[in-house]
UniProtKB/Swiss-Prot annotation:
GO MF term list: mechanosensitive monoatomic ion channel activity
GO cellular component terms listed in the entry, alphabetical order: plasma membrane
UniProt subunit comment: Homopentamer.
Family annotation (NCBIfam families): mscL, PRK00567.1-4
Similarity comment text for this entry: Belongs to the MscL family.
Bilayer-spanning residue ranges: 14-34, 38-58, 86-106
Gene, per the UniProt record: mscL
Membrane topology: Multi-pass membrane protein
InterPro entries on file: Mechanosensitive_channel_CS (IPR019823), MS_channel (IPR001185), MSC/AndL (IPR037673), MscL_channel (IPR036019)
PANTHER family referenced in this protein's UniProt entry, alphabetically: LARGE-CONDUCTANCE MECHANOSENSITIVE CHANNEL, MECHANOSENSITIVE CHANNEL MSCL
Record localization: Cell inner membrane
UniProt name for this protein: Large-conductance mechanosensitive channel
Function summary: Channel that opens in response to stretch forces in the membrane lipid bilayer. May participate in the regulation of osmotic pressure changes within the cell.
Amino acid sequence: MLKEFKEFAMKGNVVDMAVGIIVGGAFGTIVNTLVSQVLMPPLGLLIGGVDFTNLYLILKEGSKAAAPYAALADATAAGAVTVNYGLFLNSVISFLIMAFAVFLLVKAINMLRREEKAPPLAPTTKECPYCLSIVPLKATRCSSCTSELGK
């Protein structure tokens, strides 16, 4: 059984998948940092200095302190029940950037993999000049109208 597992684990597809998962995880960290540290601060300034991570809706005030809360962390510490749509926006933007980056990567790989198209095959049929039926190239008579065909 150990031998079978080793054969399975060493197949090309399994190893490729494992490498893809590891690289994907590292790439996800890079994209998350790009979104949270590079893209979101200027975007927040454009919409009035809002930090998306602190965008939330209070469903129920906390028992430890009353609203308003300065930040999501304060609301959470006070025990408030919140809908954190700012964190959701960060996740959506992060996903879109990740998806676009993967699209560009796949597109680049596909451009490198393009194979030359095979030359078109020589024709194996021809058209009868009398009835316009398709007949084999080597035929001397049309099977539809029985006309003699020139070579």
